């Protein structure tokens, strides 16, 4: 797949550099590479809803002032179908055909890692709101993110289950074919065994994307004597695993990760997920200030509480707009303007996001805190504690 993507990129590269590289001076165009269909369409919906709400708010107030000129925002949404190859194709279209100044997304690491390669190759700023895999930004000066990384999230989960449940033995179940759960599972295992010693992860079970029967792996986990099950899977897969585990006799805690944090989780899982915990980026219940304003506005407009993807998309888009403002003026030359935006993104410090304060490292990753959420007996995501670097 990598060879075909790079071949496609080279073909487009020839086309791009044979045409004028300028953009409309009347609107600021931003591309969104998001999953509107496929395995995780709720992620795409949340992303688009948050972006549209922000765009309407800014355009309604007159637009974005950059230097001595004011621009309206134009957002272009491309469906990456929750697939890596579609994400790269979407990035190429946004960059070369739509000639956006920057790209927001993809969200999931499986799509963000390859799309990041394309954006960096074309020197186009990209901000992934939700991708926690280090490979997304590694050695890619044009690629940023609005969330913490898995090398931080893995130890957060390992320390939490140790302190909260007194866990001395852990089991892990994850999709070996997907970048996000595979990476996070490995970081959790390393952190847990650093605390409790080699072999304390007594079951390290895998499956592959689209599997629906986990009975063999879960039987091994139940028999392993583990005190905790770590399940770093997406919200659409979690209910299947949880219900099958409970049917096989699992009565101990299950710890999740930020990929649990979708409103869709409780529709699919219901009471089976009550009482479980997961690490994430923000908690809607009990929010205050600008975060509460965002939640109330989103809930009023769309009829449900925004998940972490919506909140992170809001923050990622605002980060981009701040960087654009900080250029102090756009030239109309898309290469120069993309470079200027990239440079300003790297300089952002103490950005007050609704998911927390952020300062970018030289790698394009924000230094920020994680939140531990408990799923209440009402099915709500309740703030439990905050964990900072």
Question: Where does each model-flagged region fall?
Answer:
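C-terminal segment of classical bacterial N-terminal signal peptides
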Residues: 15-23
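Extracytosolic ligand-binding ectodomains
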Residues: 2-4, 8-11, 23-389
């Amino acid at each position: 797949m990598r060879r075909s993507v790079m071949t496609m990129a080279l073909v487009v590269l020839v086309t791009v550099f044979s045409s004028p590289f300028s953009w409309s001076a009347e609107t600021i165009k931003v591309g969104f590479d998001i999953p509107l269909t496929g395995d995780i369409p709720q992620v795409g919906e949340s992303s688009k809803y948050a972006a549209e709400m922000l765009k309407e708010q800014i355009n309604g107030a007159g637009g974005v002032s950059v230097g001595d000129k004011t621009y309206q925002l134009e957002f272009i949404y491309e469906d990456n179908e929750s697939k890596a190859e579609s994400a790269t194709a979407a990035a190429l279209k946004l960059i070369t055909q739509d000639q956006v100044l920057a790209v927001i997304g993809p969200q999931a690491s499986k799509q963000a890692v390859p799309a990041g390669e394309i954006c960096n190759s074309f020197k186009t700023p990209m901000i992934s709101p939700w991708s926690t895999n280090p490979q997304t930004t590694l050695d890619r000066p044009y690629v940023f993110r609005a969330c913490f990384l898995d090398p931080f999230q893995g130890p957060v989960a390992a320390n939490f289950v140790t302190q909260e449940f007194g866990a001395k033995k852990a089991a892990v179940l994850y999709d070996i074919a997907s970048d996000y759960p595979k990476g996070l599972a490995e970081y959790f295992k390393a952190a847990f065994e650093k605390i409790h010693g080699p072999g304390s992860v007594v079951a390290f079970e895998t499956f592959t994307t689209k599997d629906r029967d986990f009975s063999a792996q879960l039987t091994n986990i139940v028999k392993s004597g583990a005190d905790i099950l770590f399940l770093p899977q997406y919200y659409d897969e979690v209910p299947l695993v949880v219900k099958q585990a409970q049917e096989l006799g699992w009565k101990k805690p299950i710890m999740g990760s930020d990929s649990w944090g979708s409103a869709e989780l409780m529709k699919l899982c219901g009471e089976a997920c009550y009482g479980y915990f997961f690490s994430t980026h923000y908690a809607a219940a009990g929010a205050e200030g600008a975060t509460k304003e965002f939640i109330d506005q989103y809930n009023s407009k769309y009829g449900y509480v925004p998940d972490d993807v919506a909140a992170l998309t809001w923050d990622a888009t605002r980060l981009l707009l701040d960087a654009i403002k900080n250029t102090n003026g756009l030239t109309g030359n898309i290469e120069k303007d993309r470079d200027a935006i990239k440079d300003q993104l790297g300089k952002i410090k103490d950005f007050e996001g609704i998911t927390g304060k952020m300062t970018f490292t030289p790698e394009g990753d924000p230094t920020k805190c994680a939140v531990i959420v408990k799923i209440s007996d009402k099915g709500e995501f309740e703030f439990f504690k905050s964990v900072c670097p």
